[in-house]
Regions:
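Active-site rim helix/loop that mediates acceptor-substrate recognition in acyltransferases
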Residues: 1-13
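Conserved beta-hairpin
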Residues: 13-23
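Conserved beta-strand in the GNAT
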Residues: 21-29, 37
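Conserved acetyl-CoA binding element of GNAT-fold acetyltransferases
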Residues: 35-45
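Conserved acetyl-CoA pyrophosphate-binding loop and the N-cap/start of the following alpha-helix
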Residues: 47, 51-56
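Conserved acyl-CoA
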Residues: 55-70
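Conserved active-site alpha-helix within GNAT-family acetyltransferase domains
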Residues: 65, 69, 76-92
């Protein structure tokens, strides 16, 4: 399954779809041109326990690193994943 990214008008999401059904998503909004806040992560029953939630967070980290951005996580799940030392460089 491929993680897709959509950004529009100050908000966006990374998501996983199959057969037109959203199976997991992580949403965010822009605080400034350099910082975005991850405010929600959700994985459907079909993907629970598969690591897809962490893959969504990693997609955001990859995006932040590629574009020299910072992440402010308010979603408890994203906050937990991003507390690892390996992600310190992208935290706002």
């Amino acid at each position: 399954m491929e993680i897709q990214h959509y950004d529009n008008d100050g908000r966006g999401r990374w998501f996983i779809e199959a057969d037109g059904e959203t199976l997991g998503e992580m949403t965010y909004f822009w605080n400034s041109p350099e910082v975005f806040t991850i405010d929600h992560t959700e994985v459907g029953e079909k993907l629970k326990g598969t690591g897809c939630g962490k893959k969504l967070v990693r997609a955001a980290v990859d995006y932040a690193r590629q574009h020299s951005l910072k992440i402010r996580p308010t979603c408890p799940f994203a906050k937990s994943v991003l507390s690892a030392e390996e992600f310190a460089d992208v935290l706002a």
